[in-house]
């Protein structure tokens, strides 16, 4: 069964997935490979609706895999009702990684290599509203929740590896 790592941007989904399995699937990288450009460039060129369609198609593909796979999802994967229904069908294997808004905001502010449009184009208050909206959706889908704030990615991966 596919284990989906859910959570807000900056929480460490990709880093933890890499600790769990060197052959993990990162939905954002899969999408970028399909479109031949960065997601931020695609957003600018084609818009969010086109991106969300690609994201839904990619989610369907990774959930259809027969083998046990670790998947790092994009932070906005839960915005689509169709995606939420697909994720619900992956019952017992949806793992939410959490941290406080302030911790995530600070991480994103310090990350000079990966500047994300959603972060750059909103005030802190607007970004907090996005965080709250998405957290409610993540929590409604999560079978297991792990707070990552005082844990290393390796410790979080060990917790996930020991889950039944």
Curated annotation (Swiss-Prot):
EC number: 2.7.1.71
Chief location: cytoplasm
Protein name, per record: Shikimate kinase
Pathway recorded for this protein: Metabolic intermediate biosynthesis; chorismate biosynthesis; chorismate from D-erythrose 4-phosphate and phosphoenolpyruvate: step 5/7
Naturally occurring in which organism (per UniProt): Streptococcus equi subsp. zooepidemicus (strain MGCS10565)
Positions contributing to substrate binding: 28, 52, 75, 134
Cofactor(s) the protein needs: Mg(2+)
GO terms of molecular function: ATP binding; magnesium ion binding; shikimate kinase activity
Entry's family note: Belongs to the shikimate kinase family.
Record: residues binding ATP: 10-15, 116, 151
Cofactor stoichiometry and binding remark: Binds 1 Mg(2+) ion per subunit.
Taxonomic superkingdom: Bacteria
GO cellular component: cytosol
């Amino acid at each position: 069964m596919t284990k989906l790592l859910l959570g807000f941007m900056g929480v460490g989904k990709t880093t933890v997935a890499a600790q769990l399995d060197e052959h993990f699937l990162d939905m954002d990288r899969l999408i970028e490979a399909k479109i031949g450009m960065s997601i931020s460039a695609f957003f600018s060129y084609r818009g969010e609706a086109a991106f969300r369609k690609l994201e839904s198609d990619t989610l369907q593909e990774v959930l259809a895999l027969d083998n046990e796979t670790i998947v790092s999802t994009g932070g906005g994967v839960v915005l689509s009702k169709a995606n939420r229904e697909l994720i619900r069908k992956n019952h017992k294997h949806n793992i939410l990684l959490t941290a406080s808004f302030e911790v995530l905001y600070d991480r994103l502010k310090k990350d000079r290599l990966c500047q994300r449009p959603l972060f750059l184009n909103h005030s802190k208050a607007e970004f907090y509203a996005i965080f709250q909206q998405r957290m409610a959706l993540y929590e409604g889908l999560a079978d297991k929740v792990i707070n990552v704030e005082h844990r290393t990615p390796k410790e979080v991966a060990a917790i996930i590896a020991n889950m039944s």
